[in-house]
Amino acid sequence: NTGMRIGEARSINWEDLKRVKDLSVVTVFGKTKKMRDVAFTQGSERYLRNLYDLRVKELKGENPRNDELIFLSRRGKGSIQSFKTAFNSMIKFVGIPKKGINGDRTLYSCRHYYATNQIQKQNANVFILSTQMGTSVEMIAKYYGHLITEEIAGHIGGREGRHITATEKVYPF
């Protein structure tokens, strides 16, 4: 729900979370070690609150330390090295096939799904999307440029699905 990389999520502490206006935001260190803020959806925010409550329960009513990692290993001693087993169990549980159109589904597939959904369904501004995901506009264009649909093309052209008529002939664009 954020488009962040797995390594970025793995290194988040509770103190990295904050409120900006009405949004929950987390500060992450990206692939190039550059710091950026990533906005959470309401679903992600609920999930993090549930994780926090579970951690308080594990700590017998105590709040976790601010510098504690959000995604801890089972023993509570450091970051989870791999989310692979949990991810595979989850997709099996919800009935999603392991094999997708482009090969096996992995946790990184969620990042691609996020970008695809933002472009196709949310008409996301590519500059904002690249900032949220910690990548360049050029990389978004390289990997997701093929997703420009008739709707988006119409939106960009200011015609939004209308046909252009010249004389009596109707053109399909």
Protein language model annotation of sequence segments:
Residues 12, 51, 86, 90, ...:
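Residues in the recognition helix of alpha-helical DNA-binding motifs
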Residues 16-23, 123-143:
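Short, polar N-cap/turn motifs at the start of nucleic acid-interacting alpha helices
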Residues 27-34, 43, 133-158:
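Catalytic-site neighborhood detector that most strongly recognizes the C-terminal catalytic loop/helix
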Residues 2, 38, 56-64, 77, ...:
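Short, basic (Lys/Arg/His-rich) helix/loop patches that form interaction surfaces
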